Amino acid sequence: MSRKPIIAGNWKMNKNPQEAKAFVEAVASKLPSTDLVDVAVAAPAVDLVTTIEAAKDSVLKVAAQNCYFENTGAFTGETSPKVLAEMGADYVVIGHSERRDYFHETDEDINKKAKAIFANGLTPIVCCGESLETYEAGKAVEFVGAQVSAALAGLSAEQVASLVLAYEPIWAIGTGKSATQDDAQNMCKAVRDVVAADFGQEVADKVRVQYGGSVKPENVKDYMACPDVDGALVGGASLEAGSFLALLDFLN
């Protein structure tokens, strides 16, 4: 089954609104047709208004880097999925290892967020991934599988088919170490197999699975050649317009 690739840049806690606007202006007119690939950037909350406004007449989609699982209320410092939808965001990244690690997010939190995101008409990009210790112990498939099952629990088959899963081995995020092509393929296939077990093969064949972890213009083509890798969630290489655009060269 042919799945449309999705390349998403995750700016993390970088860029002020002026820098975000300049980035979008630099890349927007150079992006390929949405028939070929979906392209998105995940901007910090303080940059979302500017980024969405700058991207609105282009094919560039915009993601939030997180949200809460309630729409309104006494949740100081949190971001409402309802307001993200009203602002014009397309995606919300949830379950990133930095959120799990530094902010103690649980699989249950991530599952609640996924449901809230869908309830507001947005699409979740659900992250999963194992530590170096888990990887070296040979338990990556089991660990990541449990994360995926928990994150998707209670969603409909239709919802799961439409979301994006991002496999990011924690040991490869921002470390300069990247998974081999075989590692990426095997783990993205394992993620898809969990979806097949929980929701059926037809859903698994539709869901898009990204690889993330030190993806750069030099290695993106190798990852995109893997049958079960449908895209990339990219950190460092998404901060400069030139390197971000170069990630799309795999299409040639």
Swiss-Prot record:
<feature type="binding site">
    <location>
        <begin position="235"/>
        <end position="236"/>
    </location>
    <ligand>
        <name>substrate</name>
    </ligand>
</feature>
<feature type="active site" description="Proton acceptor">
    <location>
        <position position="168"/>
    </location>
</feature>
<comment type="pathway">
    <text>Carbohydrate biosynthesis; gluconeogenesis.</text>
</comment>
<dbReference type="InterPro" id="IPR000652">
    <property type="entry name" value="Triosephosphate_isomerase"/>
</dbReference>
<dbReference type="Pfam" id="PF00121">
    <property type="entry name" value="TIM"/>
</dbReference>
<dbReference type="InterPro" id="IPR022896">
    <property type="entry name" value="TrioseP_Isoase_bac/euk"/>
</dbReference>
<feature type="active site" description="Electrophile">
    <location>
        <position position="96"/>
    </location>
</feature>
<dbReference type="GO" id="GO:0046166">
    <property type="term" value="P:glyceraldehyde-3-phosphate biosynthetic process"/>
</dbReference>
<dbReference type="InterPro" id="IPR020861">
    <property type="entry name" value="Triosephosphate_isomerase_AS"/>
</dbReference>
<keyword id="KW-0312">Gluconeogenesis</keyword>
<feature type="binding site">
    <location>
        <position position="174"/>
    </location>
    <ligand>
        <name>substrate</name>
    </ligand>
</feature>
<dbReference type="GO" id="GO:0004807">
    <property type="term" value="F:triose-phosphate isomerase activity"/>
</dbReference>
<dbReference type="GO" id="GO:0006096">
    <property type="term" value="P:glycolytic process"/>
</dbReference>
<comment type="similarity">
    <text>Belongs to the triosephosphate isomerase family.</text>
</comment>
<feature type="binding site">
    <location>
        <position position="214"/>
    </location>
    <ligand>
        <name>substrate</name>
    </ligand>
</feature>
<keyword id="KW-0413">Isomerase</keyword>
<protein>
    <recommendedName>
        <fullName>Triosephosphate isomerase</fullName>
        <ecNumber>5.3.1.1</ecNumber>
    </recommendedName>
</protein>
<dbReference type="InterPro" id="IPR035990">
    <property type="entry name" value="TIM_sf"/>
</dbReference>
<comment type="function">
    <text>Involved in the gluconeogenesis. Catalyzes stereospecifically the conversion of dihydroxyacetone phosphate (DHAP) to D-glyceraldehyde-3-phosphate (G3P).</text>
</comment>
<keyword id="KW-0963">Cytoplasm</keyword>
<comment type="pathway">
    <text>Carbohydrate degradation; glycolysis; D-glyceraldehyde 3-phosphate from glycerone phosphate: step 1/1.</text>
</comment>
<dbReference type="GO" id="GO:0006094">
    <property type="term" value="P:gluconeogenesis"/>
</dbReference>
<dbReference type="GO" id="GO:0005829">
    <property type="term" value="C:cytosol"/>
</dbReference>
<dbReference type="GO" id="GO:0019563">
    <property type="term" value="P:glycerol catabolic process"/>
</dbReference>
<keyword id="KW-0324">Glycolysis</keyword>
<feature type="binding site">
    <location>
        <begin position="10"/>
        <end position="12"/>
    </location>
    <ligand>
        <name>substrate</name>
    </ligand>
</feature>
<dbReference type="InterPro" id="IPR013785">
    <property type="entry name" value="Aldolase_TIM"/>
</dbReference>
<comment type="subunit">
    <text>Homodimer.</text>
</comment>
